[in-house]
């Protein structure tokens, strides 16, 4: 089945690098195509693709844009809203055209505001903190951008679109990074999952991470699949950890931060299976040489690493049945 409602997480930096690949995807999913200006090679408008040519229903796309995207590409937000206004006028059935229901579909943070403001809620593994993270995501996404570029508070419209969503998509184009190298990925992707849970729709939307690091071979993976790929390829790869040992204090900090970011996905979205944390434990505290290195180079990072594993275990986000792990954590077997 085709997805019925899809939320796209739009970042300004990625839009610059890909020349708007994500936005073009949003247009195509809605059954639209960009109209190009021959003189400048810029997008000057849009064309509506007929259903007969699409051979599928139009997909209800909601754009959650970052503050940077809002400021750098106001024309794209306006273009999308203008296009869906025209779709609302089409003589098509509601089953084929969800845009017959007229409502804002481009949302972002308050003017002048950036980021999601999840903060400490990512590190506190209580239900209350998860709810606070979801509320922060909603609050930072509650301003609608219309076809004239006017930005208004539209929390109710946002929540309505989210409750209809069955898919969430984030695209990554940078080959030199991954979703465990910065907390922003967890804040945006797992934060959406926390927001859905806040609305009583936890698990209703599938979470997808699109890999566009090789433009000629794009890959779509579930968020769990992408996390497993990154853990096995880098985070739990002994060669990577050994490489970090050459960077002293900073290398030890990167090892600890990688676990922090994986933990945030587990806390906010529940998408990290136990065996991935087992792999992380084996690759870090399970290596005597790595523990000795961190103790010498950055004992604070080592203490943070141990505390993070312990907090995950105590919160029930990671359950290990291995006595050696439980002994290292100081927990009863």
Predicted features and spans:
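Ligand/cofactor-recognition surfaces for anionic moieties
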Residues: 1-333
